[in-house]
Amino acid sequence: MEREDDSIFLFHAPCENCGSSDGNSVYSDGHEWCFVCEHRVPANEEREAKLSTRRRTGGSKPMSYDVWNFGDSNGRYSDLTARGISKETCQKAGYWLAKVDNRMYQVADYRDQNGSIVSQKVRDKDKNFKTTGSHKSDALFLKHLWSGGKKIVVTEGEIDALTVMELQDCKYPVVSLGHGASAAKKTCAANYEYFDQFEQIILMFDMDDAGRKAVEEAAQVLPAGKVRVAVLPCKDANECHIMGEDKAILEQVWNANPWVPDGVVSALSLKDRVKEAMTSEDAVGLLFDGCQGLNDRTLGARGGEVVMVTSGSGMGKSTFVRQQALAWGKRMGKRVGLAMLEESVEDTIQDMMGLNNKVRLRQSDEVKKAIAEDGRFDEWYDELFGDDTFHLYDSFAEAEADRLLAKLAYMRTGLGCDVIVLDHISIVVSASEESDERKMIDRLMTKLKGFAKSTGVVLVVICHLKNPEKGKAHEEGRAVSITDLRGSGALRQLSDTIIALERNQQGDMPNLVLVRLLKCRFTGDTGIAGYMEYNRETGWLEPSSYTGGEGEGDTGWTEQDGQSDF
C-alpha cells in the first residue's frame, strides 16, 4: 500500500472489467482504478515496466524512450524542505527526485493533455539544467492539470509554480514557462488558445529586469483584456514563501492589477516623431497593385484598417486579393497571413506560385507536371516562400468564429503578420449555429474591427452581395451600391475602405473589371477608381486604359472571345 501512495495519476484508459472507454485511471506504479465499476488492478513490477510504452486511447504515441524512467532513476517523491514545498504537492505536479550515477537530480515531468510524459526538465544540485524527450517551444509545466476556469497564474520556473500550487492546496490553475523568461513571448503566443480558456491570466514573473521585460513581451501576445501582473515584495514567489510572505502571493493571485501597455506620452515630446511620421512612406499606406486610380483615391491601406472587397459571384474577388497579397509580401517585404476558407492551402499555394511566375498553374496539368519533373517547382517555391513571408490558415471549410479569431490573432501577435486576408466573411457566419445572421455579422465585424485597431494589422475581408430584387444581376454588369453588401449594416459601418469589382460576364468584354470605391474613411473619396483586365495567360488582373462610362460596363466594348476565366 505504501507503494501505491507514492504513485501519481498518468492517464485515463479503457476498463477491461466494465468496458468503460475512459473511466479507468492508470498510475505510475502500474496499478489501475476504474471510477465507473470500482475495479482495481494491483501494481506489479512487470506492469510498471510496460507503462513507458503503453499506447493511449485514440492511437496517440507512447511515452518517449529518452525521458527518465521513475523506477530506473531511483525516483522518489519528497518534501522540498528548503523550498517549503510538500511531498503531496510534488506528487500532484509530477516533480520528483532522481539518483543517477550517485548524483541527485530534481525532475519536472512535462505532460501532454492526455497525461503522457513528453519531456522533462532535469536540474542538478549546482542548478545546471537539461531537458529530455521532446521539449517543444510551447512547453508549459502543469498544463495537463487544467483546462479552463476563472484564473490561471503563470510563473517563470517550476519551483515558483509549485509554491503557488502549495499555497492553494493544489486546487487552482498555475503553470510555468518551459523555457524560462527569455522565451516568454514565444511560449505564450504558442499557447494563445489554451490561455484564452481562462478569464484572467496572472503573470507572476520574477521581480527583476528580465522578469519585467518578459511581462511586457508576453502580455502583448496574450488575449487582450485578460492579462494581470503580479507585484511581489521579494524576488519571486518561492522567496516570498520562504520569507513568510504567503499573504502577499495570495493577494496578487486574487487582486493583481490589469496589465496596461506602455504608450501614454506627452504631446510635447512627440514633435519630432510626428514630423518623421508625416514624411515617411508608412504615411501613404500599403499601395494596391494594378489600379493606380485606387491608390489615388485611398492613399493605400493603413495599419488598423478593415478593407472590404466585394463583388458578385465569380467576378474576381479572390484573384484580386491574392494579387494584392503577393505584391505586399514579395515587393514590399511585408508579412502576410492568408485565411482562404473556400480552398485548401495547397490550392492557395499553387495560385500564388502561378501568379508569381505569370502562369495559371493550378488550371494546367501539363505545366504542373513539367515543373515537377524539370526542377522548377523547388526553384519557384523557394523563391516565393523561402523567406517565410506568407502564413496560411490550414483548416479548409472549418471556420468557427472564436477559433478563427484566435488563429488570426496568432498570425499577428505570434508571427508578426502586417496584413491578413480573410476570404470570406460569409463562410464564417454560415459555420455558426446561431440563427440570426445579422446579429452574428454585427458581433463578428465588431471583433474584427477591434482586432485590426488594437493590433495595427491591415485586415482585408471579402464579402458577398445580396441578390437584387429586380433588374439585372451584379454578374451582368449591375453597378454595386454600398447597401448591396449581404448581411448587416455593420459591414459598411465598421469597414474603413470598401472596394467593389464590377463586370458583365455575358457582355462583349467579360474579362474587363470596373473598380469602384464605395467608401474610404481616410480620404472621404468615392467613385470609379479605374479598370483592370484579366489576362488569361498569366492569371493577372492588369491595368486597363479603358475609360467607359459609369453604369455602362457592357456598352461600347469590343468583342474579344466571349470567354470568362475568373
Swiss-Prot record:
Functional note: ATP-dependent DNA helicase and primase essential for viral DNA replication and recombination. The helicase moves 5' -> 3' on the lagging strand template, unwinding the DNA duplex ahead of the leading strand polymerase at the replication fork and generating ssDNA for both leading and lagging strand synthesis. ATP or dTTP hydrolysis propels each helicase domain to translocate sequentially along DNA. Mediates strand transfer when a joint molecule is available and participates in recombinational DNA repair through its role in strand exchange.
Span list, region Binding to viral DNA polymerase: 549-566
EC number(s) given by UniProt: 2.7.7.-, 3.6.4.12
Annotated region described as Disordered, given as residue ranges: 542-566
GO MF annotation list: 5'-3' DNA helicase activity; ATP binding; ATP hydrolysis activity; nucleotidyltransferase activity; single-stranded DNA binding; zinc ion binding
Gene: 4
Any one Pfam family match given in the protein's UniProt record, by short name: Helic-prim_T7_N
Catalytic activity: ATP + H2O = ADP + phosphate + H(+)
Site (dTTP/dATP binding): R360, H464, R503, R521, Y534
A GO cellular-component term linked to this record: DNA-directed RNA polymerase complex
InterPro entries referenced in this protein's UniProt entry, alphabetically: DNA_helicase_DnaB-like_C, Helic-prim_T7_N, Helic_Prim_T7, P-loop_NTPase, Phage_T7_Gp4_N, TOPRIM_DnaG/twinkle, TOPRIM_dom, Twinkle-like
Signal peptide: none
Lineage top rank: taxon: Viruses
Entry remark concerning the domains of this protein: The N-terminus zinc finger domain is essential for delivering the primed DNA template to the DNA polymerase. The central core domain contains the primase activity. The C-terminus region is responsible for the helicase activity and binds 1 Mg(2+)-dTTP.
The keyword Zinc-finger is assigned to this record: yes
Residues that coordinate or bind Mg(2+) 2: D236
Family label: Belongs to the Teseptimavirus DNA helicase/primase family.
Domain SF4 helicase: 280-547
Positions with a binding annotation for Mg(2+) 1: E156, D206
Positions of Zn(2+) binding: C15, C18, C34, C37
Domain Toprim per the UniProt entry, residue ranges: 150-237
Cofactor: Mg(2+)
GO biological process terms, semicolon-separated: DNA replication, synthesis of primer; viral DNA genome replication
Bias kind Low complexity: ranges: 555-566
Listed name of the protein: DNA helicase/primase
UniProt binding sites for ATP: S311, G312, S313, G314, M315, G316, K317, S318
Complexes and interactors: Homohexamer. Assembles as a hexamer onto linear or circular ssDNA in the presence of ATP or dTTP. Interacts (via C-terminus) with the viral DNA polymerase that is bound to DNA; this interaction is essential to initiate leading-strand DNA synthesis. The priming complex consists of 2 DNA polymerases and 1 helicase-primase hexamer that assemble on the DNA template. Interacts with the single-stranded DNA-binding protein. Part of the replicase complex that includes the DNA polymerase, the primase/helicase and the single-stranded DNA binding protein.
